[in-house]
Amino acid sequence: MAENQYYGTGRRKSSAARVFIKPGNGKIVINQRSLEQYFGRETARMVVRQPLELVDMVEKLDLYITVKGGGISGQAGAIRHGITRALMEYDESLRGELRKAGFVTRDARQVERKKVGLRKARRRPQFSKR
């Protein structure tokens, strides 16, 4: 491994992302594909870029990311969390700014399980009075 490479693990819902950061010119590679190829939705791309834009490092760092599990928004959130952790490893002074924006905290919300006798997690079968 290169000496000037920084690592962060991010998780969100059922997705997990491994993020490697090194000085470069702003190239983002996710599972051997570019950011534009991997995420069709602009909202997901924005979520991924948020921590980099906050600390003005979009053009200064190259990112190599592998992400598994979950759907589009979960993967985007996991990547954002991983980038945030890698940035903190890169420069600890960024922690306060990232924390204020809410990127450091792991979003612990998970899908609630379906219960027996109900149609979904909380949706009850229709009630008929007569």
From Swiss-Prot:
Signal peptide bounds: none
Gene Ontology terms, MF aspect: RNA binding; structural constituent of ribosome
GO CC annotations, alphabetized: cytosolic small ribosomal subunit
GO process annotations (BP): translation
Keywords recorded for this protein, A-Z: Ribonucleoprotein, Ribosomal protein
InterPro entries membership: Ribosomal_Su5_D2-typ_SF (IPR020568), Ribosomal_uS9 (IPR000754), Ribosomal_uS9_bac/plastid (IPR023035), Ribosomal_uS9_CS (IPR020574), Ribsml_uS5_D2-typ_fold_subgr (IPR014721)
A family per Pfam: Ribosomal_S9
PANTHER family xrefs: RIBOSOMAL PROTEIN S9 (PTHR21569), SMALL RIBOSOMAL SUBUNIT PROTEIN US9M (PTHR21569:SF1)
Assembly with partners or alone: Binds ObgE/YhbZ (AC Q8ZLS5).
Annotated family: Belongs to the universal ribosomal protein uS9 family.
Protein name: Small ribosomal subunit protein uS9
Organism: Salmonella typhimurium (strain LT2 / SGSC1412 / ATCC 700720)
